Amino acid sequence: MRGKIYWILAALLALSCSKDGMNPGAGGGRDSIRNIPHEMIVLGNRLENPYKTENMSKALASIYPTKAGLVAVQPTDLYVRFLPKNQQELDMLKESDISLLDHPLDYDILVEGDWYHDPEVADDAVTWQYAVVPVDFNFPDIEYQIIHNCFIPDDSENLRSTGIDWEAVERQAYILTGNESRLNDLTLTKSTKVTPSGRITIVDESANGGKAFGVAGVRVSCNSFVRFAHTYTDRDGYYVMPKNFSANLRYRLVFENEKGFSIGVNMILVPASVSTLGKAGPEGISAEITSSSEAKLFRRCVVNNAAYDYISRCRYDDMNILPPPYDLRLWIFHSLDESSAVMLHHGAVVDSEGIAGFLGQYASLLKYFLPDITIGAKNNLDYASLYSTVCHELAHASHFAQVGTGYWNKYIRYIIQSYINTGDPYGDGVSPEAGYCGLGESWAYYLESLMYKERYGGSIPSFGNSFWFYPQIFRYLDERGLDRSDIFSVLEANVTTKEELKSALIRSYPHKRTIIEQVFGRYVN
């Protein structure tokens, strides 16, 4: 979609806010990933899976010919693929806590990328999702296929008691299946596995003295064939995988954060966006991301950090406001200007047929991945502008958590009707239900301004001050002793106009009555 239709999309994905390259890791031996492509994966030839039960049996017999008949190699895991057909089936898979990839695990990768879509699956449907599950996995009622029975050795007491060097057997399976080149020279020399670890960082040129800091709470995943591991970075970007490996690995960031939000991507039908980090040794990979990195990767990491920061700061000893709902879904639209907090995934209901008529190519996404937050990234090219936008939309999400869907539906209806009538989603401020918009936007612009100042210093920016709803009311109160927590506490579902806000503030803070009356007298006719 182009031009004006993008604007309509932003308005209909409600609460639109009309506001005035990767570098190599620093660790020794870490591969440079500067030139990794981030489009569709290109598959090569199918490979022989060394972890197939029969291949591990052959490797055992090759190294321990006298023990092969005494030690049975039984399947420990299943290499499978699922074909979910709707949102419920995707959620069922997500709740199973298994690592899903949208491409097969036993193919050579000719060209790295962030996504793959099986050519035999319709473009508007979810593609096959590949996974490795325990042999006793309780399969949900979702179409699936078992590709291989696998034996994936671990460090359990049962395996150690056999007296067999299973690491050597695993390496031999790679050799016998023609995959010796995928083994790492380090592990071949030392005959031992390595635990992947590293650090993922990002640079905000306007903060932290321009020094890199961690990409926080993001999921890091790696695999060699069907041997998987994943973990989350800590707040400083460090990670350590829970498993050891002897082969070279493919690494990726999965934008599903430990704080309870995921970042999706338009027209890529996966629950959370994936950014490949490419191939590296089993010792791990590190990466420093900057504004000159691949654009989608940079934006995803900024949105990730901004949301992590916001949610972390909602706690009692900091901002002391309700955090956004758990399992928050954010979409980044790289070709849109406007952002929104539509909260569809959490129950805000708009005429979906009407929205779909405007969404065009994006309509098919609604039935799979209803968004809560949409981030228009077209002109948000630097860290600071993206950070500001995310804070604004998450302020809306906190407000939603307090007032509920009934309030939000009226808010959305006003936005849509205002755009239809006037071409401005904020309207004229006098139409029915204008108060919902006025209060919601005042709160979001106010909190956005505070968080921007707290991150970047200087004076408080005047975001939104030219609009009819005057967010400077909250700033005025803040400067005179009512902080963001005090203000947020009165933004309840029964407060829908500036007059009701004034009354609620006076009831809650009678000692500030004079100041409250002064500011409302100045900005409210």
PLM features: what roles do these ranges have?
Residues 21-157:
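Long, solvent-exposed N-terminal ectodomains/accessory regions
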Residues 37-40, 44-60, 64-70, 74-76, ...:
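Pan-zinc metallopeptidase signature
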Residues 50-57, 61-63, 196, 201-226:
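Short, ordered, surface-exposed loop/turn motifs in non-cytosolic proteins
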Residues 224-238:
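Short, acidic Ser/Thr/Gly-rich low-complexity loop/linker segments typical of extracellular
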Residues 242-244, 291-332, 336-343:
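Zn2+-dependent metallopeptidase catalytic core
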Residues 343-386, 390, 394-404:
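Active-site scaffold of zinc-dependent metalloenzymes
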Residues 394-411, 443, 451:
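Catalytic Zn2+-binding segment of zinc metalloproteases
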Residues 401-433:
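Post-HEXXH active-site segment of zinc metalloproteases
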